Amino acid sequence: MKQKPAQPKGGQAKGGTQVKAAAPSNARWGLYTMAAIALWIITCFDNNGSYFTQKMVGVLCTVGMLCVMLFAGKDKVKRLMTPPAFALAAYMLLSAASTLYARSRKFAIAQFAVLLASFAVYLCIVLFSKDGKIAFRRAAGTIAAAAAPVGLLSIDAASCNILMRPVRVIMEAVGAGYGNTGAYFYSRLNTILGNPNTYAGLMSIACLLSLWLVITAASRSQKILCTVLLMVNAVSYLLAFSMGSLGVFVVACLAMLVLSPSDKRMDLFLLLVQTAVVALIVGAVSVKGFGDDVTGSFLPIIMLIAGCAAACVLEIFVREKLVARLADKGKLLIGLIAAIVVLAAVYLAAALNVTGSYTFGTESEFRRALDLPAGDYTLSMQADPSATVRITYKNTNNLVQNNETDLVNGASDAPVTFTVPEDSKLVFFYFGGEPGATLSAADYTGAKDGSVKLGYKLLPAFVADRIQDLTANGNVVQRGVYRQDAIKLWKTSPVFGRGLGGFENGVVSVQDYYYETKYAHNHYVEALCDLGILGLAAFLAMLGTSVWALVKSRKEKPLIVMLLGACVLQMFGQAISDVTWSVGCCLPTFFAVLALVTLHCGDCLKLKTPEKNKGGAVRWPVTVVSAVFIVLISLNLIAQSKFSSDSLTLDDLKQCASIDPFETNDYKLSYLISGGNEEDVASRYAADLSHVESNAISIPLAQYYASVGDYTKALDQLDRGAKYTRANASVWQKMFDLYEQMIDPVGSSIGAAQWLQDDTYVKRMVNGYETLCQVNADQLDDVLLTDANNSFLNKLLAVNTLDPYDFVEALTTFSTLGLDTAYLPDADGNGVPDCATVQEGSVTWGENGAFTADTDSVVTFAAVIKTDGDYDLTVQSSASVEAAVGDTAVALDASGKSTQPVHDLGDTENAMTITLRVPAGTTVSHVTYMKK
């Protein structure tokens, strides 16, 4: 009796012939389901959770990691004796060490907690997953399945909100972070993770895994399940439309094709085409069910279900047969690829030019962009019933700062005129209308004639919107600025870096204009900044050893290498432009992929160790570091719980500062501003904080020093804070607020007058103003002060001119001066007083606040008047002018002085305005508003 030849383990016979794998038991199905749920929970809470939530997840995962390392068998621990594992371990150890020397240990431990949770995922896969093709497939399916709910909930959250509503309640109950995320769609899916680009980093890996699962499915039921999984991941990935991620994804798919065995290449190619076509159709129709807020529309979910069904039908009844017919026809594959490239080029050309009217749906506006030459234009719109337009432009500075400058607002009921400046790079049109309104034409005439392309008939609306500014994209330019600033920070600590969170903490100290970002948007530069040359070397080693392991394993495991090669390319490729290696939504999945590389490809590089070796070189370092950080993070969580309690006392703050090495600065600062006055404790805390590099400590610490009468140290802290956060207008405004509280005797402490006995502090504060002027001269953007700041500076600059300095005159100036144009601040250095505005007409400004009207003009001056009383307005001018204080007209005599005093009640919060109507040719040389 003939026997069938034995099949090798893993479900694949010699020559690559696929065989049916044994179905997993119910217990194993339950285990994989629990693993997918656990990975999903870690992903969600590590991404959107508060720092407290991230650290809680991190410490729980670290406890699990400790148990795993203690009880894992020696053979399993030896799986880590391979270069890919060593590289990742080096990166983790450098990150761990950096939390103890980081400039901001608060940021560092939160970031490291995410890394700890991700490393726990890595160890669980390496130590508990079996080493075989079936085990690999199950692990890949678990990772892809963990991402699918994120995609499904993201689509639901921005449309019908049925699934996300109960999930949101549960997530918020466990930890804040999901209050309203994902509830809108503007040009792309915002996603429940709150960032389409990092979400795309997660879903791109899920899509690659899902593609591989479909082409390696051993049964029809597996194909159907994996096809549904693929469509959920692919549609949600496409709707996020992260152009950087999609660009890398295309390259990753090409790499997957190149690396795939010849008998799978046509299979994969047809699956890629099928998935792309179905996902594009589903996405294009689904967009109509999204809007600026939750729409309640079921269309996106219905289309997703329909897309899954269509893909399953195509998979079973079309693609399978095509694959069978086209097998072993490599030249045909090349021809098909060439044909698709040509068709794609033709389609793209047609899609960009076949346009028509635009009918508004649930979205309130859409944008279009044109590269228009400088000059005057008139825009005429045809709309039913009506539409609005807001026209803006971007110049080089706008691109760097990623903002726009408004030109004009208008409506379709009248022509809209606008002027494109000489330095314009791109002009944007934001059209708005009610749902159902149709904008049929938008024609412009002027320096160039033409029409704005409105409705792209062959492009999905979200794609049309995203491609508008490809030629002048502010995001791309601004990320270049982030990288440059990260390099500046790296130079302050080139070998070990500034510690995790070092970029977030220090970027304010090197900015040429104010912006807010936590990351450098390039992880190679981020690693260099945070962990120095050693950290970058470790990160590059992770990439290099992974590639090395894949190359060495390709002949033996071609199917596994084709997938992992594409995943590695995607992970490390998108790291060039996004923050995917810094956020909790991506890191657990990325570490899971690295675990698959270590387990299934790293064995070819495994170090040879004696049989008696128990893997202690790996086991004990990981165990010790895990135990140390379990203790440290637990102490941090205990301190944070006390700090957040309603019954917090000064003794609690001292205890928190003593047990928590990561957020001790917060407790010390809270102790000081809460009135802690134990002499040794308060002085020690203040001295400690005075040396901290922080973007948040200087102002409250200066307030503490001022409250105890140490004005010299208060001013030193303000100078230090202004230098460190030089581009932040809020810090400068608070700095001048504190100046005023310290030295202005009007409305402040009566004791403030003693600091006017001589001009020492006056000159220190004037020096602060001059520093601001220099900062504005050096930066791209100007730091402007509040009306209250400007009014205080008006008095301060007037006092500074007293020669010789006189205490009584200084007090009189602070008490009586409401406005004096001779001493108005001009922090931005444009020759115009910061409190002055030309409401109508045109004027030419001279020195000391004087100006000449070029045409009939209206000029206003804003001032904050602190004290109730009668005030005299005096306007010295070459001809008569009309004046008003607030809404009250003021009559002026021949000398320019008000004939009747103006009674001002005083308002320390709101500015009053002095309005002057000045005839053309008239020079106003001096304006004063003084208390009688």
Residues covered by each model-derived region:
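Transmembrane signal-anchor hairpin modules in multi-pass inner-membrane enzymes, especially those
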Residues: 1-97, 103-107, 120-121, 127-144, ...
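Loop-to-helix entry and N-terminal half of a specific, functionally important transmembrane alpha helix
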Residues: 34-39, 147, 226-233, 271-278, ...
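Membrane helix-loop boundary segments at the extracytoplasmic
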Residues: 41-51, 236, 526-531, 563-592
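Membrane-interfacial helix-loop-helix modules of multi-pass inner-membrane proteins that assemble, modify
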Residues: 149-201, 231-247, 254, 281-295, ...
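TM-adjacent membrane-interface loops and short helices in multi-pass inner/ER membrane proteins
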Residues: 162, 195, 460-474, 478-517, ...
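Hydrophobic transmembrane alpha-helices and their immediate junctions
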Residues: 222, 533-563, 729
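Extra-cytoplasmic beta-strand recognition segments
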Residues: 362-386, 414-416, 420, 425-431, ...
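Exposed low-complexity, polar/acidic, P/S/T/G-rich flexible segments that act as propeptides
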Residues: 433-461, 919-932
